Amino acid sequence: MKQQNNPQALREKYIRELNGANNSALRAKELADDLFSLDLTVYSQNFSFRSIVYNLFAMSEIDENISMHPEQLQIVSKINENAATIISAPTSFGKTFCIFEYIVKYKPKNVVLIVPTLALVDEYFKKIIKKYKNKFSHYKIHTSLNEEKIYDFNSFNIFILTHDRVVQETNYHIIEKIDFLVIDEVYKLETDMQNDRVLVLNMAYYYLSKKASKYVLLAPFIKEVNDIDKLEKSPFFYGSNYSPVVNDVRTFPILQEQDRVSECKRILKSLNEEEKTLIYFPTVSSMYKYISTVIALEPKKLKFLDHEVLFFIEWAKEEIHEEWCLITALERGYLIHNGQIPMGTRMFQLDYYEQSNLFNKLLCTSTLLEGVNTTAKNIIITKPSRISNSPGDHFSAFDFFNLVGRTGRLHQHYIGDAYYIKSPSDPEYRKADAVKSIRFEVTDASKDIDIQKGEVEKYQDVVEFLKKLNITKEDYLANIGSKARFDTVIDLYNAYAMNKIKLLAQLQAHIEDGRVGRLRLVEILYKICEQKEKVKLESNLINTLLSKKKASYKKSSR
């Protein structure tokens, strides 16, 4: 497409010019009229008469030092005009800021913000509500729901919650009234029968959108939502590719899988150490391998670390293990983020990444990138996949460019750089392929959605299963079915039945013969708790810890 027919391509041309200028402020002053015409008002600032006039009218209600760009103003206006709105725009657009701008400007009484992760709950609270506390002082902030607590819906409330917490039957009824509902990352509403979380998010939307006087759904890279007229309140769709920063992808070919580690090391060494850099790994094991084979060989930087980090390192060495990968990373100026790291430890690392100049490199898996808006100049994609290293688990173009979009931040970087380490079997990605049409499962043909709506009688296998458990469909939805698909529940039940037989047999063996060892019983119980088959190592460790002469965790793990 020619640039004159593609405003974003023109924007990128001018952003690159600012980035390459010896004096970007002087160059912005020279280009002020062009920048203003392209809606790059954040760069034209007060360098032209039109910009000065515009900024007076576009001043943020939250922060008078910020002027909203024209498309942000449009979004706030569309939210106000429509009972329901779906907004698709790049990560750097500033969608979340628009939401809080609307809240401050129009003051809806009961606000519910639904986000994918607890990390985002914390981010919204710290970076916006706490930072601009004078603007939200009349709101009571809730980051969890308590069935025993009485909430006053006649006063001003903001609930910031994960969808897991609101979809449960009891929690859903706690929220009596919603004046303004926002659900983030709604591309995850797209039908995926293999994913239980898709069902959870769809039901959160289904229940809460009916209660809400007004709602907004947020996502990147969505071209359209199929059957949008079937959704609650027939939402208005606003799609934009506006971005005030440029995301570049640089491809670094490798010939063999084992070259990924050395290439990542080489790229990282070539980058400015003062720039924030994310290093993405598809699995926790590949991350830990990089730490043990590359980072562990780097010199320690203990004399540069503050006392809080040093205290944590000493505590972790004593209570966990001196060779824990996190300790190895911290001592050398790296942070790590994955689902195996305790939540509190993840949170304090994110704070250091955002606020400290000592920690500019963060190793992560998809647990971070799906749930936190970090600031990064660079990202190294060591392999374009998640969960697995197998070729069949490659990223889609949507996944890939959603990752790339995590680089570059307004007021910090004109250009964000993604470094793609590509083997011969890895895909080529085109940005045009990332923009997709989706259909929410709640409007699709779905057995699980029917069950959630109480339409159980349609399915004989469901009816028979409820009879076997001797429970009503209401009991099923309240206590079992709110977080899992029916097929998942059946698999869990069958595993439970099998483990129950084994457990009772082992208990009977203990009753009949007191000399029977405890290890087999520990193995069965651990399998039940962790839903894993291979548990020999863990069972031996637990059995040791349960012995009368208790050893420390560190000694037991040896």
Locate each region found by the language model:
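N-terminal helicase ATP-binding lobe
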Residues: 1-558
